[in-house]
């Protein structure tokens, strides 16, 4: 009887310790790591492309893809989203999706090659999901990759991705200043981006020429 009591006590202690360890792991591994300077997020374990899309590998060998936090924030309001159709064979750099606001449209390239297996129908019905949760609920598509081992080497992850994003934010501020210098109408407050003004929704205030320039500078296929 004493032996059974001792065994039960040990099992109880082990169970409590396991629960504590899991709680610590959850606290130590948040779903997204914040970029301190500009309030943009990068999830741990996601690969980021230079065209501001991301790749998350699944346990089944497929790849979930979407738009990063920087792009969705600076674009601002989105009226509609169109995604490459099911079973579409995409090469890296082909158009994965288009986003539109009024008469302005941006084409966002696929970060990897493969076949479109699933499209996020909820996102198509509610484009605002891209703003609310770009890395989880706002995913764009699931792709069956074909050159994943090679193409992942061209993407950034973790600290490398964070450093690159900080440079992109700085480059975007310079881009907005250049737009002002060439005579593009600049909304009030936007010219103060170098002073730390919010970047959210900046592009929706600009005309089609600026959107086209943003496409060439920040969303070009690699």
Tell where the protein language model's regions lie, with residue ranges.
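Contiguous, well-folded functional domains in the mature portion of proteins
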Residues: 1-222
